[in-house]
From Swiss-Prot:
Gene Ontology CC annotations of this record: cytoplasm
Full protein name: UPF0291 protein EF_0064
Species of the source: Enterococcus faecalis (strain ATCC 700802 / V583)
Domain of life: Bacteria
Predominant location: cytoplasm
Length: 74
């Protein structure tokens, strides 16, 4: 993922300095989509491991999240 981000930043800098060709613009779009897909996957993995407890120690994780976690781990 770091290489994708570096390439995105390189293209952004080049765009500011001299502009991008249509091929580079298409590459930038693809790289951004790949980066966002990776971020979303990481977020979902993190969320699937979350359990929410109230101050008394009871599990108050929303049912919808519990259902999604069940699907994820099955």
């Amino acid at each position: 993922m770091l290489e994708v981000l570096k390439r995105i930043n390189t293209l952004a800098q080049k765009e500011r300095e001299q502009g991008l060709t249509s091929e580079e613009q298409a590459l930038r779009v693809d790289l951004r989509q790949e980066y966002l897909r990776t971020i979303r996957e990481q977020f979902n993995k993190t969320l699937m491991g979350v359990t929410i407890y109230d101050p008394t120690g009871e599990d108050v994780t929303p049912e919808k999240l519990k259902e999604e976690q069940q699907k994820y781990f099955d």
